[in-house]
Structures are given as structure tokens and as C-alpha cells.
């Protein structure tokens, strides 16, 4: 560990290192030096992100651009370089990075009230706005085709054909639900290909716990966990936030009668997001509801594909866990369809 701690340009000698936070992908530690300077030290999961150099280059480019937009150091993650001036260190075959600790900030797992949810929308909208003049072609796709729904359907059809465990017979209703929506769910990708919807810098994990809020004011400071920052549609980020933020139930709720999309929460998030992102194009605004529906559907499709394939991708904690997850997402999609006119009305009124 001492070799690792010596690898970074910390201010002072590190005196303590303890586990920090609750992320699933990377191991995170808080390091404090003898000058009482605090840093976040993180092991990068190179199984999930094999191109560590490309990933860290993305983060460096984005954070450097964001720094030009603010004088407040707490408003942007700040990478601590290694002693040989690199953005990450390799020690014993493991990849590590460090950030300055953001003082007087809090990170919430779930919103404690509607204001928290609204502020997360402002945070992600502001993130997109601040990066709207960034040359997005400079970024690599960390996970190629991450939200390419037609590509997800291609994998779905391949798995259906193989049906390794004979599970397809058990989920005919869910399969029918997907196939009926296949054409519509390719709309965003088609509009992206046709350049009707512009590529932007997208975050791709827009959960509340990826926003640091000011401890006193509860206003957003900065967006964190930039591993999946890459080119994409802002509708991906907006849609994913609605998918889990406006749902009335947990992602794996078995009792589908508890699952719906709250129009109130939809309205709160939409208002916050649009207010912070004034340069949304006319087309982007028009397709916001479809962003929410597509991201929710795509997530369900991935869960169903994994269930039929034998649960190889998502970690499961019970029999049929991925099927429960898929059904929850599809119930949300159906509820959005039932509330479609109201969703469009919310967007139009907010604009």
C-alpha cells in the first residue's frame, strides 16, 4: 500500500486510509495526509473498463473543460496526478486514480424529499449544458453501443434462438411485449444516426448518488462517477433518471401492482432538467418522453435477455430475479404508455 500512496502527488504524507462510499464497480478509499488534506483513492475495475487509458483521458478532457466554466473548485472533480504526471497509477497490476476530496458535501442514496430529486435534475442538466460546447468527437465510447437499442434487440434475437435453458417458453408474454415495440424502440438510434438528435457528452449513470450536494444548502455541487462519460444523446441521461427516479417501486419489485410512473416526480425532474439545459433543441424536447420510455424498455429487454440466457451478466440474489426486474421495467413502460398524453403535456408546459 505504501508504494501505491507514494505514487500520487499528495500534499503531505498519507497517514490514514479507510474504505469510503458504497460504489459497486470500483473500490474507494479516503486518504488523509499529515497536513490534513483529504483525497479519494479509487481502484479502477479494468475487467469492466479494459481501456483505462481511454477512460481516464475522457475524464481529464471533460473535467478540464468544466473547470473553465467555474471558479469554485468544489464544482468539478479534480484529478490528482501521479509523481510521473499521469492521471492513473499501475501498482501490482492494478489501476488506481485519485481525486481531491470535495469538502462539505453530501451524497444521498435516495432522495429524502422532492427538492433532492429536483436538484439532481438541475445537476445533470447543468452538466450537459456546461459541456454543450465540448467537441464530443474527442471522447471514446467506453462501452460501445451502450444505448443502441436495435443492437440490444439483435442480442435478444440471438439469445432467443439459442434458448440455452428452455426458458423462452416460460416468458412468451414478455417476449411478445418486446417484439410489439421493436420498431418504435429503435427510433432514438435512427434519429441519432440521421443527426436529427445531436450527440452530446452523456454521463450514462444519472443516479442521485452520483451528485454531490452542498451540506448546508442542499444545492448541487458536482456530478461524480465519470467512468461512463462518452458521446450519446441527452435523452439517455434524462430517460434513465426518469426510469428509476420517477418509479413508485424498487427495480426488482415482485408485486407489479406497486409499480407505476409518478407523474408528479416526472414533472419535478423534467422541470429541473429543462431549466438547467436551455440549449436543448426543439427535437430533443419533443422526444423527452420517448427517452424515458426507451431507456426503461431497453433496461427491461436487457434483464429479459439475461434471464433467457441463464443469468450471466447481472448479479442475481434469487431464482427469477432478472425476470422480476424485466417485468418491473415493462410495467413501467406500460404505465408510461397509459400516461403518454399527460407526459407530453408536462414537457410542453415546462418548455
Where are these regions (language model features)?
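Active-site activation/catalytic loop segments of kinase-like enzymes and analogous catalytic loops
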Residues: 235-278, 294-313
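Long, compositionally biased intrinsically disordered regions
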Residues: 336-339
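Juxta-kinase regulatory segment immediately upstream of eukaryotic protein kinase catalytic domains
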Residues: 1-18
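ATP-dependent phospho-/nucleotidyl transfer catalytic cores
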Residues: 18-22, 43, 49-53, 105-118, ...
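Catalytic activation segment of kinase domains across protein kinase-like and atypical kinase folds
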Residues: 195, 209-250
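Transmembrane helix-bundle signature of multi-pass membrane transporters/permeases
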Residues: 230, 291-295
Amino acid at each position: 500500500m505504501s508504494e501505491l500512496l507514494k505514487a500520487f502527488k499528495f500534499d503531505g504524507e498519507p497517514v490514514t486510509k479507510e474504505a469510503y462510499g458504497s460504489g459497486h464497480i470500483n473500490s474507494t478509499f479516503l486518504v488523509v495526509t499529515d497536513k490534513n488534506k483529504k483525497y479519494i483513492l479509487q481502484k479502477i475495475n479494468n475487467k469492466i473498463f479494459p481501456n483505462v487509458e481511454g477512460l481516464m483521458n475522457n475524464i481529464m478532457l471533460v473535467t478540464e473543460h468544466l473547470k473553465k466554466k467555474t471558479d469554485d473548485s468544489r464544482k468539478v472533480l479534480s484529478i490528482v496526478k501521479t509523481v510521473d504526471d499521469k492521471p492513473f497509477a499501475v501498482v501490482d497490476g492494478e489501476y488506481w486514480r485519485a481525486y481531491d476530496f470535495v469538502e462539505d458535501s453530501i451524497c444521498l442514496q435516495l432522495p429524502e424529499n422532492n427538492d433532492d430529486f429536483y436538484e439532481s435534475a438541475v445537476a445533470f442538466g447543468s452538466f450537459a449544458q456546461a459541456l454543450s460546447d465540448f467537441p464530443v468527437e474527442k471522447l471514446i465510447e467506453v462501452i460501445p453501443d451502450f444505448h443502441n437499442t436495435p443492437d440490444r434487440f439483435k442480442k435478444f434475437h440471438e439469445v432467443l434462438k439459442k434458448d440455452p435453458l428452455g426458458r423462452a417458453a416460460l416468458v412468451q408474454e414478455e417476449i411478445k411485449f418486446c417484439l410489439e415495440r421493436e420498431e418504435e424502440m429503435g427510433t432514438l438510434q435512427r434519429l441519432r444516426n440521421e443527426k436529427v438528435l445531436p450527440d452530446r457528452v452523456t454521463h450514462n449513470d444519472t443516479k442521485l448518488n452520483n451528485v454531490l450536494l452542498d451540506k448546508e444548502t442542499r444545492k448541487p455541487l458536482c456530478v461524480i462517477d465519470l467512468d461512463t462519460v462518452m458521446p450519446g444523446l441527452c435523452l439517455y441521461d434524462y430517460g434513465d433518471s426518469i426510469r428509476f427516479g420517477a418509479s413508485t417501486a424498487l427495480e426488482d419489485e415482485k408485486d407489479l401492482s406497486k409499480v407505476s410512473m409518478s407523474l408528479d416526480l416526472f414533472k419535478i425532474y423534467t422541470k429541473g432538467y429543462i431549466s438547467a439545459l436551455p440549449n436543448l433543441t426543439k427535437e430533443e424536447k419533443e422526444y423527452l418522453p420517448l427517452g424515458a420510455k426507451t431507456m426503461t424498455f431497453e433496461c427491461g429487454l436487457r434483464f429479459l435477455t439475461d434471464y433467457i440466457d441463464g443469468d450471466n451478466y447481472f448479479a442475481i440474489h434469487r431464482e427469477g430475479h432478472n425476470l422480476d426486474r424485466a417485468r418491473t421495467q415493462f410495467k413501467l413502460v406500460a404505465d408510461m404508455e397509459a400516461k403518454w398524453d399527460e407526459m407530453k403535456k408536462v414537457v410542453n408546459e415546462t418548455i
